[in-house]
Curated annotation (Swiss-Prot):
Annotated protein name in UniProt: ATP synthase subunit delta
Compartments (UniProt record): Cell membrane
Native species: Clostridium perfringens (strain 13 / Type A)
Membrane listed as a keyword: yes
Keyword Acetylation applies: no
Classification via InterPro entries: ATP_synth_OSCP/delta_N_sf, ATPase_OSCP/d_CS, ATPase_OSCP/dsu
A Pfam entry, by short name: OSCP
Length: 179
């Protein structure tokens, strides 16, 4: 519902980071900040509690992050607190990561397999995907025993499902239609 808004915030921060040549630093800091927020129940409760003032929330963030992150990034967090959007920081981070991939002509390929792919298999798969999409490919591997065998590849909205599980499901559907 708020994807458009998340993207606008992320784009604004990305452009600041790009101007300062600190995109990777900002992305890493945002990941760590998200881990701190969502990994610390006490901090999370302070942030989401409606009766705790914005001033107190900002002070808490300044105490934790001032001097540890870039001032522009801290200002961004203050704006999110002011606009009551700080609980949606993960969404801003995801959008910023998407923008970073787009700006670097890169696509994320999510690959599921039963066993980890060998280095050679990864190299060949990346080469084929780069050839197909004419973009750099960032491969994210996931082990999933439920697929039984084969590969499941998702690049954006495209899915290549070469898993044994999907073949068995297809055969099951054909058998059920015949009965």
């Amino acid at each position: 519902m708020y994807e458009y808004l998340d993207r606008r915030y992320a784009l604004a921060l990305y452009e600041v980071a790009e101007e300062k040549n600190k995109v990777e630093e900002y992305l890493n800091d945002l990941r760590e900040i998200c881990d701190i927020i969502y990994g610390n129940n006490e901090l999370y409760e302070i942030i989401k509690h409606p009766q705790i003032s914005t001033v107190r929330k900002k002070k808490t963030f300044r105490n934790i992050f001032e001097g540890k992150i870039d001032d522009e990034l801290l200002s961004f967090l203050m704006v999110l607190i002011e606009k009551d959007r700080i609980l949606y920081l993960r969404e801003k981070l995801k959008e910023m990561e998407k923008i970073h991939l787009e700006r670097n002509n890169t696509l994320l390929a999510e690959v599921k397999s039963v066993v980890p792919l060998t280095e050679d298999e990864v190299t060949r798969l990346v080469a084929k995907l780069e050839n197909k999409y004419s973009k750099k490919i960032l491969l994210k591997q996931e082990i999933d025993k439920s697929i039984i065998g084969g590969l499941y590849v998702r690049v954006g909205d495209d899915v290549i499902d070469g898993t044994v599980k999907s073949r068995l499901d297809d055969m099951k559907q054909i058998m059920l239609k015949r009965e």
